[in-house]
């Protein structure tokens, strides 16, 4: 019997409650696992260099470095599918549009 490979998800968000909520949702999917989380982009770089994620869930607004800046840096070194999100609707919407450009 072949072992099915699960999609490895890395979540980058500074809010622990958001990480816990997404972890619960992702881990309910039979083909996905939230294998790591990082509270900021600098910690995320360490995780990405150690274990290559299949997809990154990335908060747009974080301290130290915002998600858009991190996205630009990481895509040049480690291209990987990224899903961006924000819990701050008004500012997050404008930043999400900027990220798509």
Tell where the protein language model's regions lie, with residue ranges.
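Alpha4 helix (beta4-alpha4-beta5 surface) of REC/receiver domains from two-component response regulators
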Residues: 6, 69, 89-101
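Short hydrophobic/Thr-rich beta-strand motif most characteristic of the beta2 strand and flanking loop
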Residues: 31-39, 47
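Receiver (REC) domain active-site loop signature in two-component systems and cognate sites
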Residues: 62
């Amino acid at each position: 019997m072949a072992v099915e490979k699960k999609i490895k998800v890395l979540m980058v968000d500074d809010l622990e409650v958001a990480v816990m909520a997404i972890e619960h949702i992702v881990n309910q999917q039979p083909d996905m696992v939230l294998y790591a989380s990082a509270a900021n982009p600098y910690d995320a770089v360490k995780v990405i260099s150690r274990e290559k994620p299949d997809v990154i869930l990335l908060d747009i607004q974080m301290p130290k470095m915002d998600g858009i800046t991190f996205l630009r840096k990481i895509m040049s070194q480690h291209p990987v599918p990224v899903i961006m999100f924000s819990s701050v609707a008004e500012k997050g919407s404008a930043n999400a549009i900027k990220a798509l450009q």
